[in-house]
Amino acid sequence: MARPRDSRSPSPAGSTHSSRRFRNDDRRDRDRRNDGRDHRRRTRSRSPDPRNRDRDRDRDRDRARDRDNYRRRDRSLDRRDDNHYRGGRRDNRERDRRRSRDRFDDRIRSPMTDRRRNRSRENDRDVRRRDDSRSRISGRREGTTDSPARSNRDDGRNQKTPLDDSGNGGASQAQTPKAEGGQADVDKKAERLAKLEAWKKKKESASQKQKEVNPSQTRNLLAEMDKKASGASSKTVSPSVSAIASPAATPTVESPAASYSGKFDPKAIAKKSAASRAHDASKPALGSLEGQPEKISVPVKQATTASALPANRTKASGFGFVKTNAETEKLTAKRKLDLDEEDTTKRKLTKLPALPIEADDTPYADQDDDESDGDNFAENEEEAAAAARAAHERRLQAENQMDTAEEETKPTDVETNGDVAMNNNASQPEPATQMEVDEEDDVDPLDAFMADLKQTDVRQPTKTSTTQKIQEPEAYFSDDEYDFNKKDEGDASALLAITAKRKKKDIPTIDYSKIEIEPIRKNFWHEPAELSLLTEAEVADLRLELDGIKVNGKDVPKPVQKWAQCGLTRQTLDVVDNLGYEKPTPIQMQALPALMSGRDVIGVAKTGSGKTVAFLLPMFRHIKDQPPLKDTDGPIGLIMTPTRELAVQIHKDCKPFLKMMGLRAVCAYGGAPIREQIAELKRGAEIIVCTPGRMIDLLAANQGRVTNLKRVTYVVLDEADRMFDMGFEPQVMKIFANMRPDRQTILFSATMPRIIDSLTKKVLKNPIEVTVGGRSVVAKEIEQIVEVRDEPSKFHRVLELLGELYDRDEDARTLIFVERQEKADDLLKELMMKGYPCMSIHGGKDQIDRDSTISDFKKGVVPILIATSVAARGLDVKQLKLVINYDAPNHLEDYVHRAGRTGRAGNTGVAVTFVTPEQENCAPGIAKALEQSGQPIPDRLNEMRKAHREKVKSGKAKDTSGFGGKGLDRLDQEREAARLRERKVHKAEGEEEEVTEDKKEDEDEKAEKALDAIRAAASGVLARESAKADDADAKSMPPVKTSGVVKDKAKDPLDKVSSAVSAINSRLGKAGQLRAGQPIDNKGPDAGAFHATLEINDFPQKARWAVTNRTNVAKILEATGTSITTKGNFYPAGKEVPAGAEPKLYILIEGDTEVVVSSALTELTRLLREGTIAAVDADSRAPASGRYTIT
């Protein structure tokens, strides 16, 4: 049986038609429900569709030009974006057409039926594509109530038949008007038109009644509507907002009226007509307001003729769905052109804040697609019409009140939560409240606003924010401003004090007496049975055999003889075995039991004897016994070193143990970026290896929130003798003051002078002192050679030593010590010229350069390293065979540490020291080191030592050990005496000096001296006529000595300047006169009636530059209108001016009035004073350490 040509049968499995759900299927279903017409390709009806031929003809005519490209592009994008797409992808038209033909090959049909069906199918694709051309951008399924609806205005543009004024015509799908219609459709249209006419008459009568509504009824109606709107959902259309938003678009642009693409619905037509008539009816009510400004009439006129379509557009944009199309931009531009700037601001104040609160989230173009709204139009039409008039009346009335309030109280604009609010004085609360009423744009009376404010929670944050913003100007213009002015008027010492307070690093102090501290376990020592059997005599003999270990203290544990007796964990012993440590060194044998028992220890041993491992192994056992770290906890173990290189080396020695035990360590030292070190500490670390200065920086950073010392219970000071000298002692004590009182403290060093003992005992409790091999002794494995030779022969001897060494061992390393940084770089250049690859390291270099240099030296990239004493402590290089003291060390401890860089861990090495005949003060320390280590003393060195002792006895020389023993106190005295270098070294380590009263007085004294010198150098403002008389008077007057002569005490530059100026004045007899009998050269045609001079020859170069550079002079010329000329010649200090030559360098100021010349002279005097003070400060400043200069 033949199937009718338009009847529908199930599609084959996998068919694109059966598996695909189109975006506008919901819209088609609704259209089919409304008018009984179906726009799908096939219908379920058994009767044929007579409109296929007409539809095909219209479609071929309209889409002939862009047929192929348009279909192919839109079809691929539509099917890609459809969320319900399940079938195979149709990439092009040919593939789709081939598949479509194959689907119906097995069906019986006539040729004409086939063609019609194929055309109908293609037409169906065209219909599906036409609606989706605009929605490809969104990438979302549209047409449902859950998704943002889209506009089909493109379809309206493509229609050949334009819409009429009443809105009859157009459908939800963009399709061509139908040429033929059934009789039923014609009857339906007639019935709808009849209903429409009846409805119009009804609305006209209602509009006439609304014109007579008084303002009180309008306000009551608005109050009820606001209550309803507050409880409604965000998707419910608010009539009041719709009416308020209606002026958002104007009918001046023709495109909105012509491109309306809504479906043919009498309810939509009724809504549109009602809005139009409501606006027309509201004209008399708006015009009846008295005192309405003329400028408001323009937007009101536009609002009365606005249709429902632009009204919905405003609501959508107010809620965030901004349509950036050409029509909206044109409308906005025209509205701004009609209004002046002031009116535009007011409209922002009164209108915009209300939109985000009650705006509808349904876009205007798809309003008729919402099924829930379609049935409620009739219920809301009367309220919408009434609210439209009331909204216009209320807004205009609010604008009038706002204008009145502005004239009375000149408020300030303050932004609150994206809106613009009016901010008044606190003394006028009522106008401020009224401004908020205008901002909300809801209810005109104040009581209605307050009632609505209590009910609605959305507006409360806005009010709170407004109150907070109001207080800010009050605080800004309060008494604090006058305090600031007083500070500005104060003396310079107050500013210096503020600056120093900001620079000062304060560590938050912790009072452990008020904190409950968890007890910790420190004693892990259990004496092995084999040690407990030893008698006291046997223990004494054992200690004597182990390089003569000497111990002091109570209950000293017996020394161990192998690693298994130390009480270490299995993991630690495995790492020790992997590192190849066969048995403990003498210092380790005695120090490990003492540290494992939780006692404070002072360890003194020769260089290279394994002191680092002696304090690291007990620390790991100590940390593992404590609870794990929490987020805000600081480290448990703290190791402090005097040099950065030593800190890096200790951190490197920790790494093999850290990975095995699951611990973390941070190396913090100056010169490296503190940001990375803070990040590592915040991640958590049980151990921190640091220098004191950087540790203080970390503790003071971020008000002490970076790290803390609350959990530090194991503290190590390596090279402890230097930690309590060299300026470290105050920093170390500041760190110790923030630690727990029950901590365990360990001090290790190769040298420990007796003068330091009293300082070390301050941080120790009942310590055990362990000394191996004596204090300040060079290891016996080191061969010491001391040569007394002149300075020129040193370099040739260095070349000889290097040649002999590298002939024997090409892989050997050589370390050359010098006294000063400049000498290190000079020696580097000379050795490089001789063909020896080498590098230098000293405190004047950046830390990254120092780190890379040490690394390259250890790896053998460069075999020779030239260094100052910064590399004398802790540096451990395996192949270091030769140490050369190019400049002899001036004390014993420095010599021991320099020589101890070689001959480490049982290896042998050579230390060669050059001593010049003039360095008799170095001879006693070097000779003592040779004696203690059993080395022969050269005869010339012994003679120099005796000669120095004679000088000391006679008072001609002073015997020093290299240690002050008083920390900063001693160093401060040296800095004050030298006035140079050590101050900057101290500050670089992190300790800033406080600004004392003496320093303030010095600053004031400097400023006064500079001012006196400038006043003496500047002349008074003289008239042109008085110049000759002054010259004659100067000739006849005898030289008069003034009291301005200053005695040159400390060779201060300011004193020199004052003395020179006073000498000039006493010689010339008049302040500022350049030379007796010499007239001022201001007789040119441009010479002013008044002039003044300012001699600048004897001031510092920076001061002279301040008053002669083009920028400063140009500012003075522009401000005063004077003429400023630099005259004379510059004569260095001490050089007299030849007879008949140009005078000393001075500045000539000329002007027409005395006032302008005096003003210019005052400004030049100020510049000269500032430049002089800056020059003096620059001279008193030293480089990084006072020894290194960049050439």
From Swiss-Prot:
A motif (Q motif) lies at residues 561-589. Its EC number is 3.6.4.13. Residues 969-1018 form a coiled coil. Residues 592-770 form the Helicase ATP-binding domain. Residues 236-253 have a biased composition (Low complexity). One of its GO terms (cellular component) is nucleus. Residues 22-38, 46-144, 185-212, 326-338, 967-980, 1025-1034 have a biased composition (Basic and acidic residues). This is Pre-mRNA-processing ATP-dependent RNA helicase PRP5. It comes from Gibberella zeae (strain ATCC MYA-4620 / CBS 123657 / FGSC 9075 / NRRL 31084 / PH-1) (Wheat head blight fungus).
